[in-house]
Amino acid sequence: MSKPNTETISVNIPESEGVPLPDEQSVAERSIVNQSPNNSTVVTVNSEGDVSKIITRIKNHLASFNYAASLDFNKDKDHDKVLTVGEYKISRECLLHYLSGNPDFLKSSAGECSKAIQTFSNESGNLDLESLLTLSPNKDFIHDTNFYKNLYGFNVSIADFIANNNEFKKANYNTQIRILQNYHEFLKQSIEYFNKYMNQYKVIDDNLISRSYNLMYLLNVLTFRRANVGRNINELLDSYNKLNQAIATNLAIYDSINKSKLEIAPEARSSIIDKGVQDLVNSLKQRTNILKKQGETLKKNVEDINKDTSNLKRHATGDIIGIADSLRKEVDSVATSFVSTEKKK
């Protein structure tokens, strides 16, 4: 039996992410607040300066965790420039070409994923990740942890391109905005599938859960920090709730095990059987501890999101403050849910 991974996971946020927004121009002047058809409040970015600030925050976020360490699944960065889904291979540049809606942006890469895009695009023209994953002829990858490592690395690689590549910087404003909108959607789909995978297959992998948190913070940059470019800010809460549920489900499974019975030494039959049972007991205990650590990390992340809410509120007026208050109230419910789960143990 292999030795369980008992590494403690933590997600660090750079100091720059908590720095109050510059007040040379009010949030109300830089953003438009309106109502979507379902009466949910959205905030849209309406200046090139805002795009620049989004890119800066993405860059700051990438700097908050060592790039090589964050991709320790695949030490070769080039590996994560291509997402492999069964028989389909999708290059980072090709996906960005289609996300841009601009036929001239990264035109030379247009053929590096066209079959997948043509077959599995949604109404907005974005890649429908769930359809691609569930309808692909070869589904073996769905059970392969290496695929989820690749999906994580691919998302980080896209963020790295947006933050640092000159091709993105040279693109016109409308192209940049469309890429940010559609990358936001692709990132959200990726996180949802991570959570679905962990729930459906009862995955307890501290590395995968930690990577989910890293992707959540990228989503936070795009969604909450006035960079949601027309998306509902409550999507962030929805993703956190799903992540919380995935962890809580696995905790419930392990909490249902009668620990007192596990402590009882089995009657001696053979040293090999006794050792196997003891190894299993130790493994269960260690994995339970890992899950509890993830619950603590989730709670800490909720607190960090609340700090962002406070920073926004200090530099906002009118309806924006209402949004901040609403988000704080909703996000607090995640922490309350976690505490309730803890009390039931």
Curated annotation (Swiss-Prot):
Keywords: Coiled coil, Virion. GO terms for cellular component: virion component. It is found in: Virion. Residues 1-23 are annotated as: Disordered. Its main location: virion. Residues 283-316 form a coiled coil. Residues 1-13 have a biased composition (Polar residues). The keyword Coiled coil applies. This is Uncharacterized protein R253.
